[in-house]
Amino acid sequence: MHLYALSEKLEFPDPQTASSEGLLAIGGDLSVARLVTAYANGIFPWYDDDTPILWWSPDPRCVLYPSQLHVPASLRRRINSGQFEVTLDTAFEAVIHACADAARPGQSGTWIVDEMIDAYMNLHEAGVAHSVEVWSRGAGDGRVLAGGLYGVALGGVFYGESMFYRRTDASKVAVVWLVRLLEFWGYRVVDCQQTTTHMLRFGAQEVSRACFLEELDRALRMPLRAGRWQIPDGFRPLRRATLPDENQ
């Protein structure tokens, strides 16, 4: 296959020309403008310290439609227990560093290298990268970061990047809060990028690249919810009378 080498121009090749593994292009930079252009075209960076910047558009693509989120009964009980507090965009840097430090089965290092951390911090400052923080009580009256996730939001799409947990179910709690908030705000799709058993259990599914790009085109017509996110007053992720009974 021919691997497209990016130039200084903010342009990418057609995602449909990616390799069977999803690899599309090499090089370029991680500027805010290039990253936004990439995500708007269904492309994301993924590499490590031993390689140049690599750009991917896998086929199939793992996505989660917010209305199809499945919350197991045990996780519902965990959320209702009140042992966790959830916030948005209050500790983005701590979340991305925790994701970088998290041990991954079958991986000896991390793809969230320093260059990536700096780039997504810039995206966060630009108001398009967001974090979900899950806190548990620490010693005394303090609290500790128990889990969380971060990703990029454009139009009606949230592109999930990474998550971590230090307490049982903390990352799962972050997923539920995020997806229910996205549904509340009218988002169309969560891009999970790579297929994982973890996300399939939440109701994610695989779709073809072509299907994803069509969905992306529609979703990006929605207005951008830029800036720091906040949880609406009174919002509760499980208090949705219109949702089907997920205990069945």
Curated annotation (Swiss-Prot):
**Gene encoding this chain?**
aat
Task of the protein: Functions in the N-end rule pathway of protein degradation where it conjugates Leu, Phe and, less efficiently, Met from aminoacyl-tRNAs to the N-termini of proteins containing an N-terminal arginine or lysine.
| Any one Gene Ontology molecular-function term assigned to this protein's record | leucyl-tRNA--protein transferase activity
Question: InterPro entries of this UniProt entry?
Answer: Acyl_CoA_acyltransferase, Leu/Phe-tRNA_Trfase, Leu/Phe-tRNA_Trfase_C, Leu/Phe-tRNA_Trfase_N
Q: Which family does it belong to?
A: Belongs to the L/F-transferase family.
- Major enzyme class: transferase
Q: Name the source organism.
A: Oleidesulfovibrio alaskensis (strain ATCC BAA-1058 / DSM 17464 / G20) (Desulfovibrio alaskensis)
**Name under which the protein is recorded:** Leucyl/phenylalanyl-tRNA--protein transferase
Q: Which keywords, in A-to-Z order, does the entry hold? A: Acyltransferase, Cytoplasm, Transferase
Q: A single GO CC term, please?
A: cytoplasm
Reported EC number(s) for this entry are: 2.3.2.6
Q: Which reaction does it catalyse?
A: N-terminal L-lysyl-[protein] + L-leucyl-tRNA(Leu) = N-terminal L-leucyl-L-lysyl-[protein] + tRNA(Leu) + H(+); N-terminal L-arginyl-[protein] + L-leucyl-tRNA(Leu) = N-terminal L-leucyl-L-arginyl-[protein] + tRNA(Leu) + H(+); L-phenylalanyl-tRNA(Phe) + an N-terminal L-alpha-aminoacyl-[protein] = an N-terminal L-phenylalanyl-L-alpha-aminoacyl-[protein] + tRNA(Phe)
One Gene Ontology term from the biological process aspect of the record:
protein catabolic process
Cellular compartment(s): Cytoplasm
